[in-house]
Curated annotation (Swiss-Prot):
DNA-binding keyword on record: yes
Pfam families according to UniProt: TACO1_YebC_N, Transcrip_reg
InterPro entries, sorted: Integrase-like_N, TACO1_YebC-like_2nd/3rd_dom, TACO1_YebC_N, Transcrip_reg_TACO1-like, Transcrip_reg_TACO1-like_dom3, YebC-like
Listed name of the protein: Probable transcriptional regulatory protein RD1_2018
HAMAP family in UniProt: Transcrip_reg_TACO1 (MF_00693)
Keywords of this entry: Cytoplasm, DNA-binding, Transcription, Transcription regulation
GO CC, alphabetical: cytosol
Family, similarity comment: Belongs to the TACO1 family.
Organism of derivation: Roseobacter denitrificans (strain ATCC 33942 / OCh 114) (Erythrobacter sp. (strain OCh 114))
Amino acid sequence: MAGHSKWANIQHRKGRQDAVRAKLFSKLSKEITVAAKMGDPDPDKNPRLRLAVKEAKSQSMPKDNIDRAIKKSQAGDGDEYEEIRYEGYGPNGVAVIVEAMTDNRNRTASTVRSTFTKNGGNLGETGSVGFMFDRKGTVTYPADVGDADTVLMAAIEAGAEDVESSEDGHVIWCADTDLNEVATALEAELGESEQTKLVWRPTTTTELDLEGMQKLMRLIEALEDDDDVQRVTANFEASDEVMEQL
């Protein structure tokens, strides 16, 4: 999918920075706590919590942190978080979706709007760019789990929609509502996946040169620096040469 592997590479490179990593762990903990509070504190009985725990493990979050986040959900106190999605345009008309989890809607809306404005973008209404994305589930495996045909057959049997295989690994796509079932079936056939998550998959992309990518990254990093923001997705496309210069 256009932009997907490049997006993953950006996230991986950013994840090496300690400060970014600490903030990431904080966001992952919040997702785990909210998921556990909304359902069962046992990941085996709570699909959303299972996904949150798996994502935390894929980012090398310590088990103690994960357990502490689950226990926090059962404490009976703490903040009540509301999930909100913001949509807008970044530099060069790139569509941007911001997923937030906040205990103060007004504060978060003000901060997100200001961040868009200061970084060459503008915040739109809900639905203003959402039509350019599909909500999908993804299950990722390393390249050595099997060849493309082996993974494709397993994906078809599991009820997946699409498979992208490359030297970097295999990305299996499915309907968002089928992610838990598809991931479970794949793990029975191929073993534990590297990552299982819900994403926004762009249906159209905007090609950016180096200057455009640098401007977009400034916006994305500023948005991600907000503690209320959980995830940022953009429908950019860029050449390998541009990506290497970032």
